[in-house]
């Protein structure tokens, strides 16, 4: 197949391009080229998507499939104007769902209101879900055939967000760790490599429809046990963490993956079975954590989110002082 990856230089889109090359496809990546190189074996066509598509994008012939991770509607419109006859795999997000307490998926979960015009996400990060809703609709309306995948939390080596790196750094730890909130709270992640492989499979099979791209949900305690089976985990209640100034999900004073409950009961508890039935294969959490730890050790520039180990030790000390 001849596959066009819109992007191809960072995290997920780069993993998609690399997997497609490994599987023997002809891969073209369209990107400004400012965020890194394309994988070996792929061809780069430079395209700033704030402008119309360059002639070089389509000059080499038709594409069998297009993979797009865009978040701005104008970028999707420009691509569809010249590429609508290919099979599209559009990578959206579970952030399109309006109710984070509800795990309902495609066809059942209520969507956010579409935002059809571009928004600077640095100024308004809350617009992300609505922008993706608009992008989904553009693709489904204009492409000859298409599948929309809605990933949850994408993790693994190369993650620029630093969220799962917090836990990957703890892979194999044997000391005491903070477990945030309720250990029975459901969480789910998907390894970027598994997602990329599945996206290429969807392109090969010309799968259509809309699917949540998530791994199986599991209790938070099980996730931590997979990451650090020999560690002692002390679970600290939400109220205590909030009183200590610890934020959920992301940021320097956060514990990543932890979310307020019940407001976010559904966000990391979507049904993985439809994706598994459609060919998604997921590796174990322990493998993802180990590989993330190894990547952190090999890349000094890798981002690690969340509180420091020193802050974690302070939390444990404060907790013991409160309960003794």
Regions found by a protein language model. Name each.
Residues 3-23:
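N-terminal Rossmann NAD(P)H-binding glycine-rich loop of SDR-like oxidoreductase domains
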Residues 26-32:
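Conserved glycine-rich Rossmann-like NAD(P)H-binding loop of the short-chain dehydrogenase/reductase
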């Amino acid at each position: 197949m001849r596959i066009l990856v819109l992007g191809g230089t960072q995290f997920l889109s780069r993993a998609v391009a690399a997997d497609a090359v490994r599987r023997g496809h002809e891969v073209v990546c369209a990107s400004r080229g400012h965020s890194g190189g394309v994988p070996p074996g792929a061809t780069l066509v430079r395209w700033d998507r704030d402008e119309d598509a360059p002639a070089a994008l389509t000059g080499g012939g038709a594409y069998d499939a297009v993979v797009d991770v865009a978040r701005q509607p104008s970028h999707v419109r420009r691509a569809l104007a010249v590429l609508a006859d290919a099979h599209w795999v559009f990578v959206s997000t579970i952030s399109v769902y309006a109710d984070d307490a509800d795990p309902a998926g495609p066809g059942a979960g209520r969507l956010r209101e579409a935002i059809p015009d571009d928004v600077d996400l640095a100024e308004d990060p809350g617009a992300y879900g609505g922008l993706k809703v608009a992008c989904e609709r553009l693709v489904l309306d204009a492409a000859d055939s298409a599948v929309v995948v809605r990933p949850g939390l994408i993790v693994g080596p190369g993650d620029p967000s630093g969220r799962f790196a917090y836990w990957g750094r703890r892979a194999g730890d044997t000391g005491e760790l903070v477990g945030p909130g309720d250990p029975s709270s459901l969480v789910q992640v998907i390894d970027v490599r598994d997602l990329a492989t599945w996206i290429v499979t969807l392109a090969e099979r010309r799968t259509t429809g809309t699917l949540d791209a998530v791994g199986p949900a599991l209790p938070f305690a099980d996730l931590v046990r997979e990451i650090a089976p020999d560690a002692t985990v002390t679970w600290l209640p939400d109220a205590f963490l909030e009183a200590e100034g610890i934020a959920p999900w992301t940021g320097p004073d956060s514990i990543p993956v932890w979310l307020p409950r019940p407001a976010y009961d559904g966000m990391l508890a979507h049904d993985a079975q439809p994706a598994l039935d459609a060919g998604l294969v997921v590796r174990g959490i322990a493998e993802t954590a180990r590989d993330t730890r190894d990547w952190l050790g090999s890349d000094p520039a890798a981002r690690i989110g969340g509180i420091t180990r020193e802050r974690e030790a302070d939390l444990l000390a404060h907790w013991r002082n409160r309960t003794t």
